[in-house]
């Protein structure tokens, strides 16, 4: 027995555009060293959507560093994570570590626990630069204590 590697793993975990899809139905992204590689491995329209969201974060979260952490793109201020992109089979999540505290009159942020929140981006049309800029401004203030 090879521990589920090879043909047996392919039967248990069919692939979907660079993802392995376990029984839970949520794809597991292959490990990528860079954000470019992560986004580049996504199928369309997720690739275009993730790239559009990434451009907004880069423009609107000044001074942030970005890297692959926890197997997906994460933007941090200093050592504190602020936001992330995480691909699923039919959408890309733009999430915020302190997102549950973000004022969101649009109702698009979904809380995921007591602290975090995310929005699901199904297409590039879901990327709203002005709305996301406001969320990123609030996330910066929450992260830096301002």
PLM regions: where:
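Charge-dense, helix-prone N-terminal extensions
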Residues: 2-146
